[in-house]
């Protein structure tokens, strides 16, 4: 019993060359792993052509089994350049204590000792530390993040953001210089809705009103109401304050309430008025009383002298 005769060989048939007839069912089985895009791949595989592949026949089955052995050629690998750090001119300000700006003119850092020693951190020209010199790195890609040199941003008049397949217009913050005493009309009202829906499914953000200028606070605030007193009210308040010693006592609460009802003011107004006028009016009343006492004493002295002299 021959086992080999019972095994059917796997048909690997292809029509390689000029085939004049039509192809039947073509089954392409690609078992090769995909190679990276940065690699150039060359294939070297002999094509197995069967003896009965004449390129003709209606039901001729072409099955390409690409079991390919790859010869990989690596070409696009970038070699990293060695990073070289250099220290250029000295930037130390020798006149910083005097509020000026003066540099020593050293153009490049020159170490004072061998590499790895402490002396290697000191410049032999200007005797300054290495950190005072401008550092320059070679072999390193430089990236600049500047808001003024960004070519990938849309123009500042209209900035759009992607938000779940919708375009959102986002206005830029506006810097407003407001004159003294001028504020926006919407600054005192509540802020409106920040988002409203427009046509086309887009969303627009409304910028809230800017805060008022700090110079306008003193001009737009309401003036504090100042109570004006009549001459009669002033006289009664002065006499009461002199009687209680310019200080309201708790035991005199009934007298205070009676005075407030009589002259038509509130207790707090009377208390504030006594506090504000305590120094000035109390001194004036003391001076007047002293002058009255002195004049009365002088009159007594003159009367005594007149009685003694016949």
Curated annotation (Swiss-Prot):
Sorted UniProt keywords: DNA-binding, Homeobox, Metal-binding, Nucleus, Transcription, Transcription regulation, Zinc, Zinc-finger
Composition-biased stretches (Polar residues): 39-56, 292-310
Record localization: Nucleus
Regions recorded as binding DNA: 222-285
Its job: Putative transcription factor.
Entry comment, domain topic: The homeodomain differs form the typical one by having namely 4 instead of 3 extra amino acids inserted in the loop between helix 1 and helix 2.
Segments forming ZF-HD dimerization-type zinc fingers: 87-136
TM helices/strands, residue ranges: none
Tissue: Mostly expressed in flowers and inflorescence.
Gene3D superfamilies in the record: Homeodomain-like
Metal-binding in keyword set: yes
Gene: ZHD3
Biased composition, class Low complexity, residue ranges: 281-291
Region (Disordered): 1-64, 184-220, 281-310
GO molecular function terms listed in the Swiss-Prot or TrEMBL record: DNA binding; protein homodimerization activity; transcription cis-regulatory region binding; zinc ion binding
GO cellular component terms given for this protein: nucleus
Source domain of life: Eukaryota
One Gene Ontology term from the biological process aspect of the record: glucosinolate metabolic process
PANTHER family: ZINC-FINGER HOMEODOMAIN PROTEIN 2, ZINC-FINGER HOMEODOMAIN PROTEIN 3
Subunit structure: Homo- and heterodimer with other ZFHD proteins. Interacts with MIF2 and MIF3; these interactions prevent nuclear localization and DNA-binding to inhibit transcription regulation activity. Binds to ZHD1, ZHD2 and ZHD11. Interacts with HIPP30. Interacts with KIN10, KIN11 and FLZ8.
UniProt-recorded name of the protein: Zinc-finger homeodomain protein 3
Biased composition range(s): Acidic residues: 190-199
Site feature (Required for DNA-binding) residues: 274
């Amino acid at each position: 019993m021959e086992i080999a005769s019972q095994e059917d060989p796997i048909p690997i048939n292809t029509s390689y060359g000029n085939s004049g007839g039509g192809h039947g069912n073509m089954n392409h089985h690609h078992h090769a792993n995909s190679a990276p895009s940065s690699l150039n791949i060359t294939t070297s595989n002999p094509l197995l052509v069967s003896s009965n592949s004449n390129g003709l026949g209606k039901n001729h089955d072409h099955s390409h089994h690409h079991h390919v052995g790859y010869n990989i050629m690596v070409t696009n690998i970038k070699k990293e350049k060695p990073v070289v750090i250099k220290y250029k001119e000295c930037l130390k300000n020798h006149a910083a204590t005097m509020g000026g700006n003066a540099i020593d003119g050293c153009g490049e850092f020159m170490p004072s000792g061998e590499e790895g020693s402490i002396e290697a951190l000191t410049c032999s020209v200007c005797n300054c530390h290495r950190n005072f010199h401008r550092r320059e790195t070679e072999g390193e890609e430089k990236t600049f993040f500047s808001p003024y040199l960004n070519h990938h941003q849309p123009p500042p008049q209209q900035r759009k953001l992607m938000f779940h397949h919708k375009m959102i217009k986002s206005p830029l913050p506006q810097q407003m210089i407001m004159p003294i005493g001028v504020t926006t009309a919407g600054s005192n009202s509540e802020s409106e809705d920040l988002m409203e829906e427009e046509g086309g499914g887009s969303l627009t953000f409304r910028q809230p009103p800017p805060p008022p200028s700090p110079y306008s606070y003193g001009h737009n605030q309401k003036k504090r109401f100042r109570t004006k007193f009549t001459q009669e009210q002033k006289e009664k308040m002065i006499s009461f304050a002199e009687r209680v010693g310019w200080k309201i006592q708790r035991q005199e609460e009934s007298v205070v309430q009676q005075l407030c009802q009589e002259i038509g003011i509130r207790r707090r107004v009377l208390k504030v008025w006594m506090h504000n006028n305590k120094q000035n009016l109390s001194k004036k009343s003391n001076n007047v009383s002293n002058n009255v006492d002195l004049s009365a004493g002088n009159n007594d002295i003159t009367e005594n002298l007149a009685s003694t002299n016949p």
